[in-house]
Amino acid sequence: MSNRDSANPPGFNDAVPLAICYIDSSTSSHDEYLTLLQSKVSAPDKNFRDETVDGAPFLAGDAISKGHRYSPPVRSDRASAQGLLQQHLEKSSTLENLKRYSSTLLGRQNDAVIDEPFAPFRPPPRVTLSESRRDRWLQGLSDPMVPLSSLIKTIPHGLWGEDILRMLVKFRVPFTRAIWFIRCAGVNEARSFLRKVQTTDITEWVKNWTDVAAGFLISFISSFLNADIYSFADDYTYLLKLFGRLLAEELVSPKHFLLRIVSFSGDSSLKSFSLHFFALQFFSTSLIQYTHICRKCVITILQSYQQLIVDQPANLLKFSLLSKKVSHFLFTLAQKNIESFFFPTEWDKLKPTIILLWKDFPNYSTLLSIMQERNSKAMYMYKPVTSSIRFLQIISCLSFPVGWRTLAKDLFKLLPVYTGVPLLLHWCINCRSIFSGDRNFIVSSIFDNANFDRNLIVDLTLSFVLKLHPLEYNECVAAAQLLDHLAACGYFFFSKYIARLASLGYLRESMLNSSFMDDQRKILVQLPILRMSQQLKNKIYYILSKGNYFVDWSICDEYVKRFKEDHFSFMFKKEENYAIITLSLVKIASTPMSKLYEDYLVMLFAFHYSMFQVMTKLIADNLVHFSFQSCACQTLFFICSVVPKTESQKLLLNEMGKLFQVELNFSYDSPDVNLLIEQFYEITSYESNYDDAFVEYKDATVANRKDFIEFLFHNITVSSKHTAVIFTSDLLMVLKIALNHPPYFDDLATTTFSSLLKRDECTILSFFKILQFYGCKLLSVDQIWAVVSDVYEAQDNNTTLKQFFNYLLDESTWPEGYLEERHWRSILCKEARKHDSGLKLFKLGIKLCTRNEQIMKTIWSFIHVHDCNVISEVIPDQRFLRTLTEHFMIDLRQLDIVTCLKKALVTLDEFSAPLYATWLTTLDDDELSELTDDVVQKKVLESLDNYKSGIWKLVLSGLPNCKTVFEHLLLFSLEERLDLPAAFLQDLIGASAYVMEQVPDSWFLEKLPCPLTQSLQSFSHLSNHIEVLDSTRQSRLTFLCHLILHMHGFVELTDQLATLESLTIRKCIYRNQELLDLLLFSIHLVKPNVETNDEVCNTLKAWENIESRPYTIDFPEALQQYSPRIVLYEPTFW
């Protein structure tokens, strides 16, 4: 015992412990302190005998006679060092040093290798039990009051894989005890696996177990349709929580498990999607950690949601609730990991769905703009098409409503303004297309939202017009419509046009009869002169008179008279002058209308001839006395007021605005359906438009809406009155909107459509009924294809289908008039180009129809802008495809193959080149034998003197040796001293992408690294002291970066990283943000990813943790020798 009365050693209270001195010192190093601590590790905590202090008293005689006792270091055993330490800890330098020392200590502790526990781990044994004893054991496991120490002796053998998970769900074992059981069984299985395969790597075993566990969860979700909803919900919740614990305890491979769950694709039902989405939402915390899995999750959710929208689930309330959850989940995911929304190849398809889901979030546009920027930058890199073709595909396949500002930004990123605007104008007047009703509107809308100077667009348009020669009639009319529309929008001035002709000297007497002026007169004679000054009219008349061009304006009065006599069958004469059409419509619009349908037809004609903007301008200038509201409304229905006065008018305005690509947003409450029908009767004056049977039915009380709608569909089927078909279809459309798209509507529409196709013959009236169905949004392109394919498979002769396709593809067989049906037919053909089902519909139509001249023109118009692969898919008959291309491209038959190729490379445009490539695919090997790799490469290089951007790639895409030619050109372009055009280098990027998609040849990959490295080093040397890169060098660097991006997945290109990184610090590079982004993106993708060993898959540590303790590495250093295996645990767990 210590003597409490003895005094402290002299000077004890003044002494300061060594550790405190070091902590308090502002000059001491924490490394010195750690060295000191390491030197004292072996020193015991207490010295029971200190020779320097307690040795002297043993020598004294008093100690011999009375005995020795040690001097206590403190006055009392209850003494505290608090006061001694507190005065030092209050100093700021002391706290700062303590923080540094502690951080260093903990860091070294984590890096230290911890010795294995003194006792080797022995997994608990398993015994073979009968089924009844096994069930009793599992019941004991599920009872928290049964200690695990009693269960560990009789762990049942044979429970593993899906069986162990099924039993845990069945007996509702608490999660901590369930994890213990899985560990006990799993560690035995793992050791058995290691003994069996004679290895120490358990990676394969962990992945197999993860695959089985994930498969059990997926099969459980798939079994929902045959399960009780309440028991299934409990089991599903338990199972998700159990898998959450398995992930947290590292008993499954996280990446492998999450990838399996994300990749699961059940049926397209609402229930299956809900369960799958709930699982993804539950594991979202783990998903966010792996960007590539998270990206796949986003794509899976969006694609499944798109399919749900197409299938139109019956329970709209549940679908609405699920949509809110999906939108919130994706929005949160984008905020936490925006990299998961980087999927350039899928962006175009999934972007509309993202906008639909996020439209209610107030700040989603900022997030969407970031995604749009990243995906659009990388989009063309992954798609092997030229910028010009990509440009044309975007504007040819627009789906309304359109985000015009984003569209304009994307388009002019693909092509500069000096190239993009002429191509846009060329697309607008392309005479081969029959779908030109809204092209002028698209062009002006893009101009309105592009950040370009208006004078620049005027100059580019003027230059484009002066280069138009020679022109066909349709192109002249289209050009006149375009110029008239742009003039009304302020993007063209006829006075500047005439002044430019005068400044170029073409208005001199000697030049007025030149071939150039003959081409210009073809356009001038079509121009309306209503809004021109008298001086300008006189100049145009003078120019026209020199070429013997005259316009007979008296024809306009004859057209007005014919319209008043029979507006249903009224049509303008084929190849009528556009100026006469414009003046005739203005005169018709200026006379009072006796029927609302006449107003409607005037609006329809205005849309058909792209005169909406012109008509509005004329009304505003008081040049036409016409209902301004009716014109400004721009709808296809019988509404004469922009401000809707009834619920039916609101519905009609909102729906029909889509037809003219005008967004008319009106807020309205759900109307009373019976009242809506009454208002519709008042608008349409049904007594004179409907059959007698319908009038009688209308007077009856509409007690059952479904019966009433069934009667309307039946009335369309049997009706022989054209007006009855029109107005009944319109009423069905209104009811569909008012009743919130009831599910039986689509069934009735498809059944009616099918009955029309299954008749003995398809009359023109039956075909018009189908067009009315499509125009009134009762049928979609997908539904039309589904019905047509079913009828085609069910019938043998398909006579009705042949008549249907002949009417669809050959408008010349129609009777005069029927402008509304002609309009719906052109809209249907245009929409079919955008859908896979639409392409399949045309493919079947081309197979069944009669191939006359008019049908061949329609097919020729339909396949424009598509690449040769799509064209070959739509028209698989190679003989007919060759006949079609040679019929419209006469030069193909008159020249030898090499001369024809040479001419195609310098004369074809973006519209004709894919068709030439399609023709090449129809030739046999003998005909192509002269087009060897060397010959084709030589002809391409010869065309550089008269280079047309992107044309050579489109032309060569039809050759069987296209990839090989591209590879030769890529290697040729890497030579150091070549001065290639900038546009050609840009086009080589598309060739590189094509080679990447087709998988490059081995000989090309062997030759590529050396010239690529030399080209990069040469570029680095040349740009060392340059302040600003010219266009050629920018194009070369862009090409080199894209070549690396495309090929790094096939060949090792890490040797180029050093050169790429050195370029990022050059002034001429980092001042160019676009080039810098491209370089950094290239470096990021090419830099090798260092694969870290996955501890979950490589070690049994998580499985041997039977006591469910934290890892020893997480304990403080003082507790590392603590062994929990020899400690008794609380009885609530064991």
From Swiss-Prot:
One GO MF term: transcription coactivator activity
Annotated keywords: Activator, Nucleus, Repressor, Transcription, Transcription regulation
Biological processes per GO annotation: negative regulation of cell-cell adhesion; positive regulation of transcription by RNA polymerase II
Compartments where found: Nucleus
Pfam families (alphabetical): Med12
One GO CC term, this protein: mediator complex
Principal subcellular localization: nucleus
Function according to Swiss-Prot or TrEMBL: Component of the srb8-11 complex. The srb8-11 complex is a regulatory module of the Mediator complex which is itself involved in regulation of basal and activated RNA polymerase II-dependent transcription. The srb8-11 complex may be involved in the transcriptional repression of a subset of genes regulated by Mediator. It may inhibit the association of the Mediator complex with RNA polymerase II to form the holoenzyme complex.
Family the entry assigns: Belongs to the Mediator complex subunit 12 family.
PANTHER family to which the protein is assigned, alphabetical: MEDIATOR OF RNA POLYMERASE II TRANSCRIPTION SUBUNIT 12 (PTHR46567:SF1)
Subunit field text: Component of the srb8-11 complex which consists of rb8, srb9(TRAP240), srb10 and srb11. The srb8-11 complex associates with the Mediator complex thereby blocking association with RNA polymerase II and leading to reduced transcriptional activation by Mediator.
Listed name of the protein: Mediator of RNA polymerase II transcription subunit 12
Protein species of origin: Schizosaccharomyces pombe (strain 972 / ATCC 24843)
Gene (name only): srb8
